[in-house]
Amino acid sequence: MSNSQLQPESLAEYLAHLPMSDQQRAELAGCQSFSELHQRLSSSTFDGPTDAAQASVGQRLTLSTAAELEEAEMLAVDAEGRVCLKATPPIRRTKVVPEPWRTNILVRGWRRLTGRTNPPAPKKDERVLPAARWRTVGSIRRYILLVLMLGQTIVAGWYMKGIMPYQGWSFVDLEEVMHQPLMQTAQQVLPYALQTSILILFGILFCWVSAGFWTALMGFLELLTGHDKYRISGASAGNEPIPKDARTALVMPICNEDVPRVFAGLRATFESVAATGDLDRFDFFVLSDSNDSDICVAEQQAWLDVCREAKGFGKIFYRRRRRRVKRKSGNLDDFCRRWGGDYKYMVVLDADSVMSGECLTSLVRLMEATPDAGIIQTAPRASGMDTLYARMQQFATRVYGPLFTAGLHFWQLGESHYWGHNAIIRMQPFIEHCALAPLPGKGAFAGAILSHDFVEAALMRRAGWGVWIAYDLPGSYEELPPNLLDELKRDRRWCHGNLMNFRLFLVKGMHPVHRAVFLTGVMSYLSAPLWFFFLVLSTALLAVNTLMEPQYFLEPRQLYPLWPQWHPDKAIALFSTTIVLLFLPKLLSIILIWAKGAKEFGGKFKVTLSMLLEMLFSMLLAPVRMIFHTRFVLAAFLGWAATWNSPQRDDDSTPWSEAVKRHGPQTLLGFCWALLVIWLNPSFLWWLVPIVGSLMLSIPVSVISSRVGLGLKSRDESLFLIPEEYAPPQALLATDQYTHENRWHALNDGFVRAVVDPQQNALACALATSRHTQAEPIEWLRQERVRHALKVGPAALNNSERLALLSDPVALGRLHEQVWSEGHSEWLSAWRQSVDADPHAPLLPLQPLNAAPQPA
């Protein structure tokens, strides 16, 4: 129901939500209509009554931020004379053209045989650079790694073969087997077929474990001695002035994220860079792909707040894409196309990333000192979460992670990994060589590339540029999922992306190291179904040994019977060796902490106890992850879509109902598996207890480990303590403080606010990007959208309709004016409820930003 007569209480309510003095409100209180109010606010004319609110956008916007906006020259007008905010710098387009993928080696070979020309090989950048000895050293090191892995696997495989009970494959006459009854053939061949399959799977899995062991071992030696002549961080002295032309863009692609946390981390990073005195070399970009209308409005307000509070106008930019093409890689492509030519370097941040100013300026100096480096990846340190699960994962990555990152650097040198965030990229080669075309074909492994980081690193190396890990560079931080289920949601996306990337394994021109990176990416998830099938086949072999009568004679006139053999000594030796390979890296990590000082980890006793508890916890979770990852791999091959929702980044506990729903099938599998083994051979259950027991306990372990209270209690006891908790760096302190403040005045029901609230509407109109010139079809569409929104109210509008209104400043302004002038109760009631739901109680600061670090 609407009322065309202006009600005094409505006018007073409207004016009360504008930041002006009582005298200004008194002067405007005599307005006879909202059109007159907007005209007096704007001191200008407008096209008609329905465009009254559009005319006052500039004045409503500058009531609280006039000085800051004018100083930074942030206000402008579009071609139609409408006020807009310059939230992005001027566009200077750069050509970004992805190269089509040719993934089929058979097609390339056939074209070569038939005389048809294949497309030319990708050109490397022609640069005059001094010869790099690290390339030769890296190749030699990787050959050594390959020999160590294969040699270790061959020895272990030989032992495994000797453990197997049936040793008579050579006596099986395949020709005779084909002409005898099927049941007799099965009795003879099945045990040997199972053993062979088990042996093959064992070899693959042992080789995978061996690679991790040698990587951690070399990382331990690197960190213990501190002598690494090829580390990238040694290329710069660390205090050289940054050249004026070394402009760097910090880009943060986001999509439906936790807005208070995102802009808190951005502000902390911005202020840390400002403290170095080199802020004039950096610009900050928030590149939003959000499609939730409430979150979009909250992002706009958060951007304005952080610019005002941190004096970031003209340095912190915000853009929201309306066409979300190619997910994150498409978002970065779009940035490179519009503004990439203005910058020499680009630092990619994740939504939960925080980086110190010293780290960022060091990265720029390293790029300047290493002219053949295309990407330098930092080793982000996990921190900031309080659930028991997240704290154990933070401890694991902080204690064991440095060994593996240093080991990766030892084997790969300048042909290393890029993890998609907390890294600096040289813009020119990235634009020219790293744009990603969709994978050809149809199905689950075609289309836009999901895990873009490994592919971009491979393309950068293919073009002749180095990809380095600065594993010893401090000041780079990230956050981990708060619980097991949220981590597994992320793993499903990564699993699908890594399986897609393997299609590029044989693409022409890829460096062998990055072909191996694609392979290791696949094995990170394919190892789970391989391990699962290994256990299933082992159980099947147990069933064969128990239920089938052994065949002692496999050929006619065989003189001696083939007795099943058992070698418990070899089994124990092989089992012990495998345990050493799995757990020695963790022990080496603790030894390294003992050697360098364990105070920041809670002391020698507490860090050792934390390691033992984490080992037990990881053993409990390994079978659970195995089952989930097996499901993910099968889902990818069967074409089941993986949703690409943003991960949970706040401390979040798992409810029992959700745990039962997700882990119930695993629990049932664990009980059934255990009962089957007990029925076959109870003594074998002791070997399988770590697997089936973990599956049975998956529900309580998942729920209990997600509790914040247990995480805080463990921190009070100095368990799973990390240096970032013992003595938090300034950037993390600031992030916590700003997150706390942002949550206090966080915007809820953003879309309703953008329509009804005087200030939010002005901001949304000024940032709307659909700025069409006058045209009859567009005008008709605007009228229909406004009419429909007024008719059905905010609750009935779907998200697409909301986004269309947010993108059009004219339609949004008209809707705002008509809601107030006609008194639409549904819109006004929804807005009042949203305002009443705001948290009004002031919150005390967590701790002073400049306080001295205190031990936990």
Swiss-Prot record:
Localization terms from the record: Cell inner membrane
Recorded GO CC terms: plasma membrane
The top EC class, named as a word, is transferase
Q: What is its EC number?
A: 2.4.1.-
Database matches in InterPro entries = Glucans_biosynth_gluTrFase_H, Glyco_trans_2-like, Glycosyltr_2/OpgH_subfam, Nucleotide-diphossugar_trans
The metabolic or biological pathway listed in the UniProt record of this protein is: Glycan metabolism; osmoregulated periplasmic glucan (OPG) biosynthesis
Give the NCBIfam families listed for this entry: PRK05454.1-1, PRK05454.2-1, PRK05454.2-5
Q: What family classification does the UniProt entry report for this protein?
A: Belongs to the glycosyltransferase 2 family. OpgH subfamily.
Q: PANTHER family annotated for this entry?
A: CELLULOSE SYNTHASE CATALYTIC SUBUNIT A [UDP-FORMING], GLUCANS BIOSYNTHESIS GLUCOSYLTRANSFERASE H
* Protein name according to UniProt: Glucans biosynthesis glucosyltransferase H
This chain's source organism reads Pseudomonas fluorescens (strain ATCC BAA-477 / NRRL B-23932 / Pf-5)
Q: Which taxonomic lineage does the organism of this UniProt entry have?
A: Bacteria, Pseudomonadati, Pseudomonadota, Gammaproteobacteria, Pseudomonadales
